[in-house]
Amino acid sequence: MIGEQQFPFLAEKGHVVSLVGGGGKTTLLYAMASHCAQKGWRVLVSTTTHILRPENWLWAKTDAEIQELWARGSYAVVGSPAPKGKLTAPPEADLAHWMAQADAVFLEADGAKHFPCKAPAEQEPVLLPQSDSVLAVAGLSALGHPLKECCFRLEQACMLLGVPPEACLTPELLAQLLASEQGGRKRVGSRAFYAVLNQADTPQRQLLGKQTLCVLQERYRVNGVLTQFEERERA
């Protein structure tokens, strides 16, 4: 479950929120979209890179289909069809037009190939100028595992952290990966920024998550949030 206490921007219309990282990013994206749609808001979901295609009835291709979904109290997902059951970014002018009509916009801004954590490639993330908030997501399932087993863009991650591929991911290293301006905070600038530690679904992961939150706050002055989702809620 998520709410305004964890993410204050969910209480206000007008935000454009970009999500980066791995370990539940798409699940969180749709959870936030659903939360806002349930309040009667016009919510738009899209991507600046790629996103898994949702159920067909949520995928809108025209103004009329977007308005119909909003009238039914649902969020609308927009994007151009891509291989492997994905959507890619819609034409820039179309996306800007649809964003201008929405009360809240949620954008997936990079990919992680289903790894629980990642470092960005040179061209990542793709943050729109309109985006005012960025969430860097990582899955707590990565902690305690060698980077080479749990981290997408392994070479970049090792360079950023200064460790070999065999190094186990610790709360300190995960906090560094999320808080770094070459990692989770890349290109964030003056935007609001949150580190999201997902998969906090066991006592051990919750403990490690809290340790990571402490490092984020004390060493990097970064706000962090623990989240977890039931199996039925996951994208």
For the regions a protein language model found, what residue spans apply to each?
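Inter-motif core of Ras-like GTPase G domains
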Residues: 121-143
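G-domain G4 guanine-recognition motif of GTPases
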Residues: 109, 139-140, 160-167, 177-180, ...
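Walker A (P-loop) phosphate-binding motif
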Residues: 2-39
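N-terminal phosphate/diphosphate-binding loop that engages ATP/GTP or pyrophosphate donors
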Residues: 33-85
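Phosphate-binding/switch loop-helix module in NTP-utilizing enzymes
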Residues: 82-119, 124
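A short, acidic, amphipathic alpha-helical segment used as a generic capping/interface helix at domain edges
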Residues: 166-187, 211
